[in-house]
Amino acid sequence: YENVPGMLNHDKGNTWKVISEIFDSLNYSWKLYSLKATDFGIPQNRTRIFVLGFKNSLGIDPNDIVLETKELDVEVKDFLEEYVDDKYYHGEKGFKWITKPLSLKKRVSINSKIARTQAANQQFNWCGDMIFESNPTRIFPSRVYHGEFNGEYGVARKLTPRECLRLMGFSDKFKIVVPDQQMYRQAGNSIVVNVLESIIKGVIKTGVFEK
């Protein structure tokens, strides 16, 4: 089971109470995890809750599962494409929206090494970080701006579908076969691959598939 952390407080905790009681009624031994993408090598502030459970008859204690973590040794810029199509750069309207004082105040940081949570329905596909770059070419390391829209370069751009997938742990071998908007939604709704891999490895080590 996977969900956002806020689910635990939904309806003053009653929703989670019902769900957990159902797990118990189905005779499962289970454990609740709160896992951050940054603890698994992905530079994105994305925390999700997971429930790992086994039928009581299997005799497996979920508390014995050890999830392998990975030190964060990369930054957002390491996940960006070198060459980006012009269509991903915002026009004047988008540029003014993300650089206005009110929008900037909502952003946690500038030149951040970790991206904010990728959402499926975010306007302008904003990753939450702004980087000041003096490069006079159209090749930018991230969403960048120089302070004013000049219609040629120094404008802000959104993350590409490939960059969003990378920030979710997908390798470039993953084929993009749907339009950009659908890909943004799929990436935002996905589970970080690195986290899921660690969970699966932990489950396999319990020997559950040998029983």
Q: What positions do the PLM features span?
A:
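Class I S-adenosyl-L-methionine
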Residues: 1-125, 132-138
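C-terminal target-recognition/interaction regions appended to catalytic cores
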Residues: 88-211
